[in-house]
Structure formats: C-alpha cells, structure tokens
C-alpha cells in the first residue's frame, strides 16, 4: 500500500512498514495457487526485498498479506490461533470457509485500528480449492482474486487471460505473469515471486527469482 503524499526526509526513516504489494490466488480443479511479490517498504525506502507474504493459517489454508506489515501479520497470527482451536474442537481439519470467516470477523472488528487486507485460499475435503476475499470485513468467494497496490495495474490483464478449467501449471503461469506485470509498473511491488500450490496431497512452495521472471515488451 502506498503512503499518501510525497515522501519527506523523515519518511525514509520513520515511515510505517507496508507490504505495498501484489497478491493473487486462483482456484483450479482440486486446489488453489496463491502468489505474491516480496517487497516491503517504509516510506520511500525498501526495507525488505524478499519477505514472504504468504502466511499459513492451517495445514492446507494460507492467507496472502497486504497493507501494513504489522497489522496484516497480527491478523494472520490471531486467525491461525483461533483456527487451531476450532480444528481441535472439531477433531478434524477446519474448512477454508471457516478460516475466511475468522479473518473477516477480525478485519471487521478492528477495521478502525488495523490497515490490512488478507486474501484467504486453501483446500478442504468438502469444497476442494477455494479463494475468498475479506477486504473491509466482507466475505466473497471468487474463482480468482487479486489485491494490493500492484493489482490496479493488472485488472484488465487478469480479466482477459483467465479461463475456467486451467491446470495447476497454467494457474502458476497465470499468477506469475500477472504479478510480474504488476511489479514492472508498481513501485511498491518487486523482488521475487512466492508461489504456493495447495491440493489434497499437500502444499508445494516455489520461489521465482528475479532472473527467472518472464520478460514483457516494456522491458
């Protein structure tokens, strides 16, 4: 998230740390792909080039973080704790919808105090792969979702490039291309791309390094 106003001398040292960012999640038959860039900024300074913005909430449920880094991580930690207790009560893995509801409730309860948006995605045995947006305390399931400051540059691309029934590899490519395009345009997005693929078989983590990112015309 970009800070309002032009940077000042003090903002290079004291600006709030933001995961001003590009996050994305895509459903496929049997799972989901979640991706993010890795740049974290404070004011006009980049304070972390390789921060992993994909935070686990449970074994097969992840959230993608954007907004204030501290606020987003606080919500993720609270949600993970509540979800763990929920799973113990059920004596079975919790649903992705339950995780999304927990994140939604926390986000809405502290909407005046916390500046963060978490996207929840994962797999469960009842609904398979699922993606939920929770911005501002809402809850909506989507076949794919994007968020963060970089998302404003790629709405047209993802609307045109998405097609139902994509394979896991096609979803990873779709996510990588979209985040790369956002990183090229958004000064608050950059670094490497983290990808997590979640299925019934488990969780697959991948990192796309800078020299492995796809090349586009503007480069």
UniProtKB/Swiss-Prot annotation:
Per the record, what is one GO cellular component? proteasome core complex
Identify the InterPro entries for this entry: Ntn_hydrolases_N, Pept_T1A_subB, Proteasome_bsu_CS, Proteasome_sua/b, Proteasome_suB-type
E.C. designation(s): 3.4.25.1
Instruction: Provide the propeptide boundaries.
Output: 1-20
Query: How is the quaternary structure described?
Result: The 26S proteasome consists of a 20S proteasome core and two 19S regulatory subunits. The 20S proteasome core is composed of 28 subunits that are arranged in four stacked rings, resulting in a barrel-shaped structure. The two end rings are each formed by seven alpha subunits, and the two central rings are each formed by seven beta subunits. The catalytic chamber with the active sites is on the inside of the barrel. Component of the immunoproteasome, where it displaces the equivalent housekeeping subunit PSMB6.
The function of this protein is: The proteasome is a multicatalytic proteinase complex which is characterized by its ability to cleave peptides with Arg, Phe, Tyr, Leu, and Glu adjacent to the leaving group at neutral or slightly basic pH. The proteasome has an ATP-dependent proteolytic activity. This subunit is involved in antigen processing to generate class I binding peptides.
Q: Which PANTHER family does the entry link to?
A: METALLOPROTEASE TLDD, PROTEASOME SUBUNIT BETA
Q: What is the protein named?
A: Proteasome subunit beta type-9
Q: Which organism is it from?
A: Rattus norvegicus (Rat)
